[in-house]
Amino acid sequence: MESNHVKMISGGKCMNNNEINAAWFINKYHCNPESIKVVMINEAVPEDVKDDFYVPDSSYSQSIIGLFSNAGILCDMQELLEKGIYVCNAVKTPKEQSAIPLVQIKDSLDELEAELALFDNLKVIMLMGDVARKAFNMIAKKQTGKNVIPSGSTYKLRHNEYYYHDIRVMLSYICTGGNLLIEKSKVTMISEDIQLMLSIIGDCHE
């Protein structure tokens, strides 16, 4: 993951890249990365930054809040952070077509890898869709020499247990977009996956 190259900041204090990234995370989300137990990796950032996860009343945030509500958890995005659940996107640039090309996924890998490196206490990584699966498999293969999730349909694989080191890796479906309004079965399956994730981290329904 991102190197520990040391940088100087004001006051002469030395900080490595992970410390700088952690300070950025705390400043942006008002949450210590050490408290994060779950990362949900979605597909790609929205075309408009105002639609992203941590913008109040955005389309992305409403999708997540609705899915957690279906799973029995009534909360907003900040409350999810307080529970130790962080949501991000695998691809850091908006998609320009329905299928995201591999080169675009690869262009965001370093940033995603550095993002995941912030969280020392992860228990679960949820891969929300095929793009997240591809991106995470590439990171895992770089680190360990092999994929975490094998080839196959999400429907057939989502009930299997996979691990990256000692972190449970769960395969699910994209958690944003208009398809959620149409494909009610996927909403049900995502909510089931969220319930399983909550049971793994020991969170109870409210």
Residue ranges and their predicted role:
Residues M1-S69, Y163, L196-E206:
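Active-site and ligand/interface coordination hotspots across diverse enzymes
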Residues E2-A23, P94-E113, L118, M138, ...:
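C-terminal capping/extension of enzyme domains
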Residues H30, M77-E79, H159-E161:
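Short secondary-structure boundary/capping segments
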Residues Y54-Q104:
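Short, surface-exposed acidic-centric catalytic microdomains
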Residues V131-R133:
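Alpha-helix capping/helix-boundary segments
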